[in-house]
Amino acid sequence: MPRIGIIGGSGVYGVFEPKETVKVHTPYGRPSAPVEIGEIEGVEVAFIPRHGKHHEFPPHEVPYRANIWALKELGVERVIGITAVGSLREEYKPGDIVITDQFIDFTKKRDYTFYNGPRVAHVSMADPFCPEMRKIFYETAKELGFPVHEKGTYVCIEGPRFSTRAESFMFRQFAHIIGMTLVPEVNLARELGMCYVNIATVTDYDVWADKPVDAQEVLKVMAENNYKVQELLKKGIPKIPEERHCGCADVLKTMFV
């Protein structure tokens, strides 16, 4: 059984060779796509393309609960979430990697929990991301010579539209990067006692910067980011220990009413 799961985009296929496809039926419907099982550097992993095999799910329609539940059903204990983000700060440049340490939720109508009754849970999200995996991927990015930020606050918006300029100026007062897919993925993983790390890749500056978007430049940055993520996964995943020493699963002891 795979103990590591990856949720991301098509760039993962550059480093991941699927060996088996598993259709998982969950109480929350079907995942974005059948789960693909394969190996990265000899480590068995499970992969779900977040937006579907053909990018058919916009951010607000991704079946987040089904995705996380499916990975848990297959034995996954650690989830690596890969996201593309815009920058809210000058120093977070296109092409940079951010190992997110906090998030702010500005989504509006997603399925946020597995516990809608009769059982009720209040999960602690003070430190939402696995410290063990954050350290591994930050240090690996440094070793590879990639521009990386050890911390960053991710503001997650509903989408699929982008922010207005007024919203962007507001968000940059308290966050570093902006995207549409981190929530509720991260809190659902926490509710099931799973470790979660977010590897965010900066594609461009958000609208606050008032810089014209050059489509060719964005595509170039995205291709470079895919390469960096692939190298990070190749070098970082083998460093993840078999046993968890992070305490991420401890929340299960205190979250139920």
UniProtKB/Swiss-Prot annotation:
Catalytic reactions of this protein: S-methyl-5'-thioadenosine + phosphate = 5-(methylsulfanyl)-alpha-D-ribose 1-phosphate + adenine; adenosine + phosphate = alpha-D-ribose 1-phosphate + adenine
Record GO biological process: L-methionine salvage from methylthioadenosine; purine ribonucleoside salvage
Residues annotated as binding substrate: 180, 204-206
Molecular-function GO terms, alphabetical: S-methyl-5-thioadenosine phosphorylase activity
Protein name per the record: S-methyl-5'-thioadenosine phosphorylase
PANTHER family: S-METHYL-5'-THIOADENOSINE PHOSPHORYLASE
Source organism of this protein record: Thermococcus kodakarensis (strain ATCC BAA-918 / JCM 12380 / KOD1)
Pathway the protein acts in: Amino-acid biosynthesis; L-methionine biosynthesis via salvage pathway; S-methyl-5-thio-alpha-D-ribose 1-phosphate from S-methyl-5'-thioadenosine (phosphorylase route): step 1/1
Pfam family, one: PNP_UDP_1
Function: Catalyzes the reversible phosphorylation of S-methyl-5'-thioadenosine (MTA) to adenine and 5-methylthioribose-1-phosphate. Involved in the breakdown of MTA, a major by-product of polyamine biosynthesis. Responsible for the first step in the methionine salvage pathway after MTA has been generated from S-adenosylmethionine. Has broad substrate specificity with 6-aminopurine nucleosides as preferred substrates. Can also use adenosine as substrate to form ribose 1-phosphate.
Keyword Metal-binding: no
